[in-house]
From Swiss-Prot:
Major site of localization recorded for this protein: membrane
GO molecular function, one term: actin filament binding
Lineage start: Eukaryota, Viridiplantae, Streptophyta, Embryophyta, Tracheophyta
Name of the protein this chain belongs to: Formin-like protein 11
One Gene Ontology CC term in the entry: cytoskeleton
Length: 929
């Protein structure tokens, strides 16, 4: 651990020194490059430069007519002065004299030609030495100097008179261009003027300073190169020391960092050989398998993967390109079995100790060792690729070789040195010996994130690729059988380990016939057409929603169009659901016309269109279906209407003839008149029956007993006395028994009367049972039902007498429809008469209780009575429960007092109606008579 830390510190110090020293060396090199001596301006060079300037001038799109003006006003003295400063030599001015050469060139034209020269690509000639390449910094310095000198000249010319001197030809000169494109280095004139030094105003002083400055260029270059070389050598020595230290330290670790072998991928590997590595879960290794258009396979592994065995199966016969692992991936064992042809293997930097074993059939293998920039010195030429020697034939895959210890990947890759010899490490356990060819290796598992399927497993020796494909294609595809697979556990014995492979054999042909997708039954043409419709484009005639709903309903009912056609022609009974479905989703007139005109194949239509196309050939098919539906539904509908009429008739009779209901109405009327004494509501002779629903709203002084409770208790008492008298009459034969005589008997108590009266009043709901049924009915609905039956009968009769008569058809449907119309006319006529009769009966019943109401209330009377009966049953239950819970009172000492309290139980609750108690006996007597 300390050694690794020391290496990292040494590497960090080396990198810091290189970062500090390389800029100084580079600066010296740049100074030396900028001080390259330009050639002397000879007449030949001036002419060549003039031609190049003219060519550049035209190429830049400038006006050629102004070229002569530029030649007259542009002085070559500027170029000569710059060349003297740059080279430190005394260059003679051999250019001819031109009058007016000292004139000042305009600012726009001067900037235009300088910008143009800085953007051109042309070769410069340097005397007899031929072509010579100048650096971009040299051209930048030359053009910047031209801009500065011209700016100073223009400012000096305006202030100082023109001096006498030998003019120079006005041809435009160019700096020595390079053989590759240079960036535009011309800067704006204002920036050039600001950056010009003040020493340039004095030419003699400036020349001396430039010579002193240029004289130190070469020493700076030598110093920079020396420092860079020393740093580079130190870096190389440090890398060699690190490689040697890593190799020596790894001798003590015989276990490889990572090993991917075919044995690791099998689930039956033993624990002694290491746990199998799941490649999908490795965070370090990520192999990408990408298949191109031609089936090329690229396997890419990330940095840091070592000892990787890449096995190419036999089926990879197309050209494959193996993308190598990046730097740091060492000890790559690539085994190419037979059939792996045209393999291009590229090894980048850091991939050392590559052991490639090519068995028979591995032909045309191109191994390209690509070294990145910086790994070799500039003087080292690229070596041509070396073809590998022929590989002997192998009967079985070779044993994996000893893995090399991994090398640490440094951030700055050093030049590729010759690797030291690999140390001898303990090899992994050898594979089991086999006399014959071993089993095929399993293919590498599919990597996560890869959508491509992995290649099939390799074949056995001697087998052909086409044999597997033919065998797979020959097998018929069967229906899937969904189950949950269980992974075999090699650590323990399972029941599946005891199953023998040859103990059970099944009939392959029978399985294909039973569970195959492709049906071999050719007798049913309709099923074959329906099964093949998915492969073709179906023709849609109906509305999509209508077609879908009709197809779903027909599939659920399971009726064929031929059965429908036969039933319609013979007049047989069809399911009502089927007829309603066909009528509901019947096609429109336009859709029906298109179905009739369709003359193509039926299998080209959808399921709904096929069904309708078959049955639509029958004339008036939907009118026939409507008639069949009416024939099927009429008996049931007529029976329901007749039963409703009977219920109403019985309910009216029960309500008019119920004695107990009449007694209840009498009690309510007398109680209401007594409570309304002295008001305009008193003295009533009758009341509407909906008043019965208001009895529970009036409560007594105790806050619990309502007026309905009071009325029920009174009726319970009176009905109890009456029941007792009726029982005695039957036993003794006496025609009349007074109530006072009953009260004199001490054995008769109040509880006995309550029990008898409570049974009588509780039976009122059972007595008016048909009234409750009549309350459920709807008079308007009954009227509409009868009217609908009559309308359907008229429509069917019209269809029979007009449409069917025009066809002159003598079929079973025609005969049955004629008989049905004749019979149904009598039934529907009877229903129409009964409906009128029932309406009159209900109206008479309502008038019997309410008088001449004036408006038709329908069956509301029965609804009111039904609700009142529900309230009455509830009160009777409360009274019955109260009688059980209440304590039994002790009998009074005087029989007269007990009789008096029995005779007047209502005085305590409602004293105002005490005088009415005297009439109770007479009322009971009247009822008895």
């Amino acid at each position: 651990m300390m050694r690794h830390c020391r290496r990292e510190w040494l590497l960090a110090l080396c990198l810091i020194s290189v970062q500090l020293l390389i800029p100084t060396g580079c600066e010296g090199v740049l100074v030396a490059a900028s001080n390259m001596s330009p050639p002397a301006l000879t007449p030949l060079l001036i002419n060549q430069v003039d031609q190049l300037v003219e060519h550049a001038w035209v190429k830049c799109g400038l006006d050629k007519r102004t070229l002569e003006d530029v030649r007259r006003h542009f002085n070559y003295n500027h170029v000569l002065a710059i060349l003297r400063r740059m080279s430190g030599q005394d260059i003679k001015d051999t250019s001819p004299d031109i009058d007016g050469g000292t004139s000042v060139l305009s600012l726009e034209r001067r900037d235009a030609i300088l910008n143009c020269l800085s953007k051109q690509n042309f070769m410069s000639i340097a005397g007899q030495d031929g072509l010579k390449i100048l650096s971009a910094d040299y051209i930048k310095a030359l053009i910047a100097s031209l801009r500065t000198d011209l700016a100073q000249e223009s400012s000096t010319t305006k202030s100082i008179p023109e001096q006498a001197g030998k003019p120079v030809p006005g041809k435009t000169s160019t700096p020595k261009p390079v053989n590759k494109p240079t960036d535009s280095v011309s800067s704006p004139p204002d920036r050039s003027y600001k950056s010009a030094p003040t020493e340039k105003e004095n030419p003699p002083t400036k020349s001396v300073a430039e010579k002193k400055k240029d004289s130190s260029g070469m020493p700076n270059a030598f110093i920079g190169l020396s420092i860079a070389g020393i740093a580079l050598m130190a870096h190389l020595c440090l890398c060699c020391f690190m490689c040697h230290g890593t190799s020596s330290s790894d001798l003590r670790d015989d276990k490889p960092l990572l090993t991917l072998n075919p044995s690791n991928l099998s689930a039956a590997s033993k624990s002694s050989q290491g746990n199998p590595i799941d490649v999908n879960k490795l965070g370090v290794v990520s192999l990408k398998s990408e298949a191109g258009q031609n089936g090329d396979v690229k396997l890419i592994s990330k940095e840091g993967t070592n000892n990787v065995n890449v096995v190419h199966p036999v089926s990879s016969v197309s050209e494959s390109t193996l993308m190598p692992p990046p730097e740091g991936a060492n000890n790559v064992n690539m085994v190419h079995p037979e059939g792996a042809n045209n393999m291009n293997v590229v090894h980048p930097e850091g991939a050392n100790n590559v052991n490639m074993v090519h068995p028979e059939g591995a032909n045309n293998v191109n191994v390209n060792m690509v070294h990145p920039v910086g790994s070799l010195s500039e003087s080292t030429p690229m070596q041509p690729p070396v073809m590998p020697p022929p590989i002997p034939k192998l009967l079985s895959p070779p044993a994996p070789q000893a893995p090399m210890p991994p090398l640490k990947a440094s951030p700055v890759p050093p030049p590729e040195p010759s690797p030291p010899p690999a140390p001898k490490a303990a090899p992994p356990p050898p594979p089991p010996k086999s006399t014959g060819p071993g089993p095929p290796r399993p293919p590498p598992p599919a990597m996560p994130g890869s959508s491509k399927t992995r290649p099939p497993p390799p074949l056995k020796p001697g087998a052909k690729v086409g044999a597997v494909e033919n065998s797979n294609e020959a097998k018929t595809k069967l229906k899937p059988f969904f189950w949950d697979k269980v992974t075999a556990n090699p650590a323990r014995s399972m029941v599946w380990d005891h199953l023998k492979s040859g103990s059970f054999q099944f009939n392959e042909q029978l399985m294909e016939n039973l569970f195959g997708y492709n049906s071999t039954d050719k007798s049913s043409d309709t099923k074959k057409d329906l099964s093949s419709k998915d492969a073709t484009q179906l023709i849609r005639i109906l509305d999509p929603k209508k077609a879908q709903n009709l197809a779903i309903s027909l599939r659920a009912l399971g009726v064929s169009p031929q059965e429908v056609c036969s039933a319609v022609k013979e007049g047989s009974e069809l399911p009502s659901d089927l007829i309603q479905t066909l009528i509901r989703w019947s096609p429109s007139n336009d859709e029906e016309l298109r179905l009739r005109l369709y003359s193509g194949e039926l299998f080209q239509l959808g399921p709904a269109e096929q069904f309708l196309r078959v049955i639509i050939d029958i004339p008036y098919i939907f009118q026939r279906l409507d008639a069949l539906l009416f024939m099927a539904n009429l008996p049931e509908e007529a029976s329901n209407v007749k039963q409703s009429f009977a219920t109403l008739e019985v309910a009216c009779q029960e309500l008019r003839n119920s004695r107990l209901f009449m007694k209840l109405l009498e009690a309510v009327l007398k109680t209401g008149n007594r409570m309304n004494v002295g008001t305009f509501r008193g003295g009533a002779q009758a009341f509407r029956l909906d008043t019965l629903l208001k009895l529970s709203d009036v409560k007594g002084t105790d806050g619990k007993t309502t007026l309905l409770h009071f009325v029920v208790q009174e009726i319970i008492r009176s009905e109890g006395v009456r029941a007792e008298r009726a029982a005695k009459e039957q036993n003794s034969g006496v025609s009349s028994v007074k109530t006072d005589d009953l009260g004199d008997k001490s054995e008769q108590t109040e509880d006995g009367y309550k029990q008898l009266g409570l049974k009588v009043i509780s039976s009122l709901g059972d007595e008016l049972q048909d009234v409750r049924k009549a309350a459920i009915l709807d008079a308007d609905q009954l009227t509409m039902s009868v009217a609908s039956l009559g309308h359907k009968l008229m429509k069917t009769n019209e269809f029979l007498n007009m449409d069917m008569k025009s066809l002159d058809e003598d079929s079973g449907f025609h005969r049955k429809l004629t008989h049905f119309v004749q019979q149904s006319q009598t039934d529907i006529t009877f229903l129409l008469e009964e409906e009128k009769k029932m309406r009159l009966l209900v109206k008479d019943t309502v008038d019997y209780f309410h008088g001449s109401a004036g408006k038709d209330e329908g069956l509301r009377l029965f609804v009111i009575v039904r609700d009142f009966l529900a309230m009455l049953d509830k009160v009777c239950k409360e009274v019955k429960e109260a009688s059980k819970v209440a304590p039994v009172k002790a009998k009074a000492k005087q029989p007269s007092q007990s009789l008096q309290s029995f005779r007047d139980p209502r005085v305590n609750l409602f004293p105002a109606i005490q005088h009415l108690r005297a009439d109770s006996s007479s009322s009971s007597s009247d009822d008895e008579s």
